[in-house]
């Protein structure tokens, strides 16, 4: 898998990534096209998915990855030694289904290497490609989704409130 075909590097603004003692942002490494470190030496991978086209009444959730990073990287680091690589944002496809395929492939790629992936942004509709990425490798899935609302609606259409 050629990551650079799937990803847009995240370039943190200096005020976002705090190098203040103990802040998480000071310990995160950032992937870009010039990245030369051993990719799989990292334990945790972060990817943003700026996709909101099927998010009912919340199309702007596609802007969430970078907003979440602002708060996440300002948190204090815990007493653990896991290494973290921020892969940037997944390139969204011409069609939402293209984004789903790319996300599923990225998840499968990392799951095969037994890596932990934290997905930022997007709507609940992203649960399906994340699940399929795990299922295609035969893994059980531990999943947590943080949201302001519980979204349960009946219907056959696949969107963010049909879960």
Predicted features, each with a name:
Residues 2-46, 53-163:
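Conserved alpha-helical scaffold segments that buttress catalytic/binding sites
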């Amino acid at each position: 898998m050629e990551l650079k075909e799937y990803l847009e590097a995240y370039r943190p603004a200096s005020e976002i990534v705090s190098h203040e003692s103990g802040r998480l942002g000071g310990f995160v490494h950032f992937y870009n096209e010039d990245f030369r470190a051993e990719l799989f030496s990292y334990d945790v991978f972060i990817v943003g998915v700026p996709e909101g086209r099927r998010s009912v009444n919340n199309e702007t959730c596609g802007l969430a990855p970078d907003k979440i990073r602002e708060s996440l990287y300002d948190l204090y680091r815990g007493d653990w030694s896991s290494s973290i690589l921020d892969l940037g944002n997944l390139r969204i496809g011409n069609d939402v289904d293209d984004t789903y395929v790319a996300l599923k492939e990225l998840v499968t790629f990392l799951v095969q290497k037994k890596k932990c992936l934290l997905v930022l942004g997007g709507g609940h509709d992203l649960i399906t490609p994340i699940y399929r990425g795990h299922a295609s490798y035969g893994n059980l899935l531990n999943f947590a989704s943080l949201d302001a609302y519980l979204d349960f609606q009946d219907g056959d259409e696949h969107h963010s409130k049909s879960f």
